[in-house]
Amino acid sequence: SEAKKKKRDVSLDGVTNVDVPVPETDEEKEALVAKFLDGLRKLLSKENNWTFLQPLMLSLDNCVKCNTCSNACPIYNESGRIEAYRPLFRSDVLRRIVNKYLKPGGKLTAKFTGADIDLNWETVARLAQMSYRCTLCRRCAQTCPMGVDNGLLSREIRKLFSQEMGIAPQELHTDG
């Protein structure tokens, strides 16, 4: 409904699949971004994510942006090839955030390394939306010549939002 759309972020494509409330104050916006960055740090730490850290880092570091994954992705193809549904799109957003905000010197070198992205509540909300625009079928990983697993990246992003931020589709999170 229109009333629900005003209270929830639908900026990606006019549809919401994840219940991300629109922050009302600047403090709420900053808190959402800070919580996301804290969760991302945990996701990239050996202590908190030792089982998936190596494949996660390989997938973040080894993408050459050839877009081979796009042709294999059923969501991207069925969407009519909408850019936001491309497997590379969501992983590249995450990659740019990690490179700019979590790597040493990232903010200084962001413009030169392709990591120039503004991290605000809208970027966080769109990343949450994008993570559920993936079936986790991992066809992207099967076709990638570099072995990048965008399905794994989507799953790890979902894990961050669900476990660290309490943001997930209602059908999954509360309705089981």
Briefly describe each language-model feature range.
Residues 66-72, 76-79, 137-143, 147:
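Cys/His-rich metal-chelating microdomains
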Residues 64, 89, 152:
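Conserved active-site and cofactor/substrate-binding residues in soluble primary-metabolism enzymes
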Residues 1-65, 70-71, 75, 99-101, ...:
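Iron-sulfur (Fe-S) cluster-binding modules
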Residues 79-93:
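N-terminal cofactor/phosphate-binding cores enriched in small/glycine residues
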